[in-house]
């Protein structure tokens, strides 16, 4: 097989002479390929052996020899591009082809199932890179899903019914309201080969104590081999579910010394990270996984180069021309909303907040959206689609002196950009300027910016009465926007006495949180793929999916 370097040199030669038979000299060719006379001879011989060209040399220095092209540079470039695509070397592919639109089409044509060297490979298209996969950090919806494929927790949650399942722990019990015990499986290994120890678990869980959700944990220790005790300062009936959350995934205790751990993490889950860069995330089935080995050997998540903002944010693993089979769609349990920052001077003007909520009513936003967005969005009147807690405010005129409003959202979210432009238009019609501020997800998560309003979103999972409160309570931004004492609410929630519907209604009626839209989650792919059940994050469990062989 020819080397990539030889292929590139032939393409340069072919492009220089535009594929035409020509009389030339070795000296001229050294200038074309920028190499010595001796090296140009070996290159021409190698290209001739590959059958790409014919070199009819004439004896004598300065004599002109004939160069004839048998193969075209375009054909070889296409072959090289196919090789790079098969090897998932997307960045090199962009450099070779040059045209990013052509690269997009090539990627789209190679989505879905691939069978290479006896391995089942799934290729998925996504609209942005997945750079941070570190549990207990600021993770977006898709990063949370991928982290669950890489890491394990003491417990796990059944995505279809919200019931608890064993994971690293095979059993657990509440010895007393403030004392829980978990019994661990033996012989569990991390992706880098080391066996899991009790110190890995105590270190992983102890690092969570500064977080609001875990602040009631007083101590984590191992009184005997394969046993973990957790002692609390206040009772928590949700603790086994809390330990199944992405925050509580177990890391190797030396994780901080491992290079670029957030982007190339090491866990004990069914898949291990092979590559993670701006154009691709590749994960491979972990043969030493303590559970059932994944049926798909490798999952490649490709990111299209410089994808336009109107690209749908659904998960896609088929090409655009394959009848657009939609495996599943569902209304998300959650949605987009606005948070009014209590640190802003605007928060001291309740009449201005009421007027803004009136302008930004869901139906008005939806009526200004394009057809595609209208199909994907639905008006929200609470945080969950099943509830109707928001009632339109009494129409009023624009408050005096309201001329400028700042809205903040995080990067790489196409729908925030679309919505913000609609909101800017609506305010401009009233003579008010909307200033848009885009920041990193980490800064958004922490609320690290001066802003009047923030875009927010929520993607709950089962059981909803657990995840709805947990996902809001864990978000530092929410603490900057809500006037309520969430710590008091957390005590009720942990004791299962917080009525979630009433709590949510109170939140919305306070005016600090304003529901906007619910989103239809979509999963598009091949019907030959079995075991696919879309979860409430819009993805599916990779380890349970498999490909049915073609019918004979």
From Swiss-Prot:
| UniProt-listed Gene3D superfamilies | Periplasmic binding protein-like II
Pfam families this protein is in? SBP_bac_5 (PF00496), SgrR_N (PF12793)
State any single GO MF term.
Answer: DNA binding
Quick check: keyword Repressor in the entry?
A: yes
Ranges annotated as spanning the membrane = none
**Region of interest: Solute-binding:** 163-493
Q: Which UniProt keywords apply?
A: Activator, DNA-binding, Repressor, Transcription, Transcription regulation
Q: Does the keyword Transcription regulation apply?
A: yes
Supply one GO BP term. Answer: negative regulation of DNA-templated transcription
Protein purpose? Activates the small RNA gene sgrS under glucose-phosphate stress conditions as well as yfdZ. Represses its own transcription under both stress and non-stress conditions. Might act as a sensor of the intracellular accumulation of phosphoglucose by binding these molecules in its C-terminal solute-binding domain.
What is this protein's name?
A: HTH-type transcriptional regulator SgrR
Name the gene behind this protein: sgrR
């Amino acid at each position: 097989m020819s080397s990539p370097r030889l292929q590139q040199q032939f393409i340069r030669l072919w492009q220089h002479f535009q594929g035409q038979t020509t009389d030339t000299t070795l000296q001229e060719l050294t200038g074309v390929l920028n190499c010595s006379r001796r090296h140009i001879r070996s290159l021409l011989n190698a290209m001739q052996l590959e059958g790409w060209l014919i070199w009819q040399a004439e004896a004598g220095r300065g004599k002109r020899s004939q160069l004839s092209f048998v193969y075209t540079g375009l054909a070889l470039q296409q072959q090289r591009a196919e090789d790079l695509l098969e090897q998932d070397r997307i960045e090199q592919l962009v450099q070779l082809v040059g045209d990013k639109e052509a690269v997009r089409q090539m990627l789209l044509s190679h989505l879905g199932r691939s069978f290479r060297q006896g391995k089942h490979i799934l290729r998925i298209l996504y609209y942005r890179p997945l750079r941070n996969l570190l549990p207990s950090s600021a993770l977006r919806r898709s990063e949370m899903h991928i982290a669950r494929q890489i890491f394990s927790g003491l417990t796990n949650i059944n995505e279809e019914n919200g019931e608890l399942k064993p994971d690293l722990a095979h059993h657990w019990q509440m010895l007393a309201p403030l004392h829980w015990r978990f019994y661990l499986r033996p012989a569990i290994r991390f992706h880098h080969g080391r066996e899991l120890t009790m110190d890995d678990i105590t270190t992983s869980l102890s690092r969570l104590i500064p977080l609001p959700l875990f602040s009631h944990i007083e101590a984590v220790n191992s009184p005997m081999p394969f046993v973990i005790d957790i002692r609390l300062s206040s009772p928590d009936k949700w603790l086994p579910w809390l330990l199944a959350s992405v925050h509580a995934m177990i890391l190797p205790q030396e994780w901080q010394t491992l290079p670029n751990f957030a982007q190339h993490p090491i866990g004990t889950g069914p898949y291990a990270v092979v590559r993670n860069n701006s154009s691709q995330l590749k994960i491979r089935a972990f043969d030493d996984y303590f559970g059932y080995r994944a049926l798909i050997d490798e999952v490649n998540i490709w990111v299209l180069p410089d994808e336009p903002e109107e690209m749908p944010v659904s998960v896609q693993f088929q090409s655009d021309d394959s009848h657009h089979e939609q495996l599943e769609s569902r209304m998300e349990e959650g949605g987009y909303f606005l948070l009014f920052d209590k640190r802003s001077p605007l928060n001291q003007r309740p009449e201005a907040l009421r007027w803004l909520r009136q302008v930004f009513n869901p139906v008005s936003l939806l009526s200004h959206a394009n057809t595609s967005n209208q199909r994907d969005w639905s008006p929200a009147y609470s945080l969950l689609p099943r509830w109707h807690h928001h009632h339109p405010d009494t129409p009023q005129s624009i408050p005096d002196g309201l001329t400028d409003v700042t809205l903040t959202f995080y990067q790489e979210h196409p729908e925030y950009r679309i919505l913000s432009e609609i909101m800017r238009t609506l305010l401009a019609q009233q003579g008010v300027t909307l200033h848009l501020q885009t920041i990193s997800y980490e800064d958004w998560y922490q609320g690290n910016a001066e802003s009047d309003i923030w875009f927010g979103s929520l993607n709950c999972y089962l059981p909803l009465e657990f995840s709805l409160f947990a996902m809001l309570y864990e978000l530092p931004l929410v603490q900057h926007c809500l006037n309520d004492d969430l710590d008091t609410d957390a005590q009720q929630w942990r004791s299962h006495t917080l009525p979630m519907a009433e709590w949510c209604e109170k939140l919305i009626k306070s005016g600090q949180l304003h529901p906007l839209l619910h989103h239809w989650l979509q999963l598009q792919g091949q019907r030959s793929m079995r075991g696919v059940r879309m979860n409430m994050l819009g993805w599916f469990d990779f380890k349970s999916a498999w490909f049915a062989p073609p019918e004979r």
